[in-house]
């Protein structure tokens, strides 16, 4: 099995074209049924005043944090929706748990203390095998949270144990993160669009 890039001898033009082609193909081939199901769960959670917790490592952590920005600020602007999104990514809390207990517990520890039944955990994991994400999902399910994940590569354990997973079928971390970031924007902007009561504003406000 080989992963992109498979060779050193690309020109920048060739690399750009191949990267763009593969990323575009992966996005266009996403399972639309899964997209719809995830959107409905997120919309239901927002309507029911549930908290959406988010987590991830590395580049995925930035997507999990950006989710809060675009849902809390973006979705609520000019709309009736008031999402509650809480990234489990406070540096002091993460480092305290990692130092005193173990890095594999950094998210599960917080889920156990913050979450309540019917909240949502949205996990971002390109590999699908990050131990701290797996443990967070397991803890969330034990507390009756609904679990959603964005994954890539073969989906890993995260895909298997999540209630819903959107699987971006790419074998490159950059493409996985690009696609997951796009998904975050798609869900945030679509939820905002559906929550705008003054329809005459649509087309006149920036998304």
Task: Identify the residue ranges that each predicted region occupies.
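Generic N-terminal amphipathic, Lys/Arg-enriched alpha-helix
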Residues: 1-30
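A short, well-structured juxtamembrane/interface segment
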Residues: 28-48
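Glycine-rich, small/polar surface segments that engage phosphate groups of diverse ligands
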Residues: 44-115
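Short glycine/serine/threonine-rich phosphate/pyrophosphate-binding segments
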Residues: 60-65, 129-136, 158
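Short beta->alpha connector loops at strand-helix junctions that form conserved
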Residues: 89, 125, 151, 166-174
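A charged, well-structured terminal subsegment
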Residues: 113, 121, 176-207
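Short, glycine/polar-rich helix-capping loops at beta-to-alpha or helix-loop-helix junctions
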Residues: 150-162
